[in-house]
Amino acid sequence: LAPRHPQRGEAVAALAVSRGLGVARRSQGQVPGPGCDVHVADTTGEMASWYAMAGVTVIGGTFGTLGGHTPFEPAAQGSAIVHGPDVANFAEAFAALDRAGGAVAVPDARALAGALA
């Protein structure tokens, strides 16, 4: 899980822990292992590597009213994309990726869970 702003890593990790999940934080040098449910990638300059390792990327900011974040970076690294309905900031790019099969739009969290299962 990569927060848009790495300084939010501690808060993101705390939220995951509060939900009973095991967490490792990249910024703290923690390595995911047994019992780690969430790896918080709260560093800068490594997103291309994370996308290259990810078979699927869920684009944040598309499940609320933020307009979504760029799909170009994960697409360039060959990571399939799942996104929510609010893609206003990159509407043409998401539409092209959806048509080409490089991205899948889902309407809500329940459908997201189904798409990732």
Where are these regions (language model features)?
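Nucleotide-activated sugar donor-binding and catalytic core shared by glycosyltransferases
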Residues: 1-117
